[in-house]
Amino acid sequence: MRDGRDTHLYKIPRHAPAAFPPCISPLRVYTTEIMSSLNGHSNGNGAIHKRVLKPGVWAPIPTFLDDREELDIATFRKHVVDLAKLGMQPVVCGSMGEAFHLTDNERVTLFKETRAALDEAGLFDTVIIAGTGANSTRATINLCHLAASSGADVAIVIPPGYFAGAMTPLALKTFFLEVQASSPIPVMLYNFPGAAGGIDLSSDLIEEIARKGSNICGVKLTCGAVGKLTRITAATATPAFADYPRKSDVAPEFLTLGGFADFLAPAVLGGRGHGAIMGLGNIYPRSLARLFELSYKIATDAQPSAQDLKKALELQDLVSGADASFTRAGIPGTKWYLKTHSGYPSARLRHPILEFTDEQGRALEKEEAVVKLMEVEKSLANNQ
């Protein structure tokens, strides 16, 4: 826990495990149902688009609901496409998406609608990361198969936290290795103690899982531990790690991603991180895409520009302040802000999480950091 943020974000109960699909052949699913993810996607004009997971920025997409708590597909599709056009890639059915409040059928619907919306917008190359976490190995593998057959390219899996006390390092390693071995798409580890019963994967355990699991494609660190990120990037950048190649062409390298926007530049510049998955990306997509662009350019340029560094650090200062505001506000604040400022029809959550009141929302939108970063966001929009 850092700055109390884990207690503010997502207090999500678990649902009962789904039944494992009978007699599913991973090879059959892999080759017949998601060939577009592996071998490219034709746009109808003969052009082939090959999707590849690579460094960048992602937003965990909220699951938009109407006032009866039913899926609002139209708003969901619009939001996914609007962000993707700005370089903010989608993570569907993650913590921000209230995944553990959704049925498996609802997750499948959102996976399918994401791929359909992106393809209809001509965004064939946009990689979809799908949340497939559940409270048993069997149920998690089931969701990985469902995600694969619904158009997702990568699964992101949180540790099963209901029986957190029984999750020894060996149990966690076994869980992730069994999931990745049976998943038809690459698997990203998701370390978020606040939403996994306090389970906090150590850097040593993450490195061991990555070495032994060739279908493990990366990790998202919502623990906020910059030192852990640095240790993982150092270990996976060594020549020795090259002896453990990744299994899938969709994810040819192991990516280490932050889980908050407030240390995006430090993670990329000082920690050799590959980007981040950030709830703040739903509100300020241009600003975060610009911050990553500057940071990655500085980190990879043989002669980095002092002017670029100055710009990156100034932007990071604003991002860190706004990230703190929206972290405190959590999912309710994000949905309220999107409804109020993007014209979305509802800010409804699936209860027991309660919606923001207008009083809370008005206080959020007036916070100095929120206002200042929105000025940058609008400036970037005007200059496009």
Regions found by a protein language model. Name each.
Residues S37-D200:
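Active-site beta->alpha loop and helix N-cap motifs at the rims of alpha/beta catalytic domains
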Residues S37-H49, L53-F64, D82-G87, L269-G273, ...:
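C-terminal alpha-helical cap/extension of soluble enzyme domains
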Residues P26, Y30-T31:
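Short, positively charged and aromatic/hydrophobic N-terminal segments
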Residues A181-S182, P193-R328:
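Catalytic alpha/beta core domains of metabolic enzymes, predominantly
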Residues D6-Y10:
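Intrinsic-disorder-associated, low-complexity terminal segments enriched in Asp/Asn/His/Tyr and depleted
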